[in-house]
Amino acid sequence: MRLPTRLKAFLFASLSLVVALTLSFGVAEGIVRLKNASMRDYNTEMWRYGRELKLPSADPRLGHEHIANSHAVLQSVNIRTNNWGLRGGPVSDAPAPGTRRILMLGSSIALGWGVDEDKVVSSFLEKKFEADGQHVEVLNGGVGNYNAERYVERFLTRLAPLQPTDLLILAFVRDGEELTRDSGNILLRNSQLALTAWVAATRVMAKASDGLVEHYKRVYAPGSPSLALMQAELGKLAKYAREHDIRVTLAMVPDVHVDLTRYPLGFVHEVFAQAARDNGFAYVDLLPAFQGLRPEDIWAMPGDPHPNARGHALMADAIYGVLAQAREAKGTR
């Protein structure tokens, strides 16, 4: 049976359109990937981080975890994980007798996104202890896109067997935000072109929404669900630390993509300072270490407001004195 001429024309036109769109998408995808091969696009490199070094967690509270014993070159920096999913080389399951072991918790800033392994806070601290004649292990437990709930639960359920003598929380203003697991649709998981379009749309919507300060005022408002969850998680961590004789230091990292000379998020720092007081943690506000610096002085690269190696060195300088005093006051176990 022969198809009517009009139907044949319609089917041919539809098929031609599908082929043309597919070819156009393929060409555009290739152009975007070629452009991003320089590893200078922050959003694309974060997307690759999620694909190459993360996997969904069986624990919904964690959302995702690092793939153990893996590595990837992201933003022109090699990031490797050991069998615990920590950034860096192999570590023993437990510290040697009498050895101080500091485990750093946090998100991508603690991880050292965009910074070589030997120039992140954990590495600088180890070198400082060594220069003072002390053998101290500083382990890097940072994971990108983690909040307080995620890094506390990861420690309690995954990393506690490492038996740290100290915990160093490298906290950030986003740590009180509630996060949900979102693996994205098939296009966002596999297409850099789709990612680029999604980022552009997100930026347009962000400009139309409330500003950054108003957002964080809602997150940290007294009685807000997000604040209550963060406080509960830090309280849970404090209880475990007391029961296991672990010293905890909370170092508050400022948001370095805003004006540091007229820093508008001091109220968030006070929330974390109060949480530290409530839980018996030592507290270090890292804002003074960054004041007077311009974004281009401390950003990992243009468009990426993570602290660079200089920023990590400044943070380590500010934190080291507190950690050294903690040892003198209590000694190692």
Question: Which stretches of residues belong to each language-model region?
Answer:
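Hydrophobic membrane-insertion alpha-helices, especially the h-region
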Residues: 12-29
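Histidine-centered active-site loop/cap adjacent to the catalytic His
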Residues: 282, 302-333
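Short, amphipathic alpha-helical "lid/cap" segments that border enzyme active or binding sites
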Residues: 148, 152, 227, 231, ...
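Conserved SGNH/GDSL esterase-like catalytic core that processes O-acyl groups on lipids
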Residues: 72-74, 78, 92-97, 101-103, ...
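Membrane/wall-proximal cationic-aromatic binding patches
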Residues: 36-128, 290-294, 302
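N-terminal Lys/Arg-rich, disordered targeting/topogenic segments
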Residues: 1-9
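Serine-dependent acyl-ester chemistry module
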Residues: 8, 169-274, 281, 286-297, ...
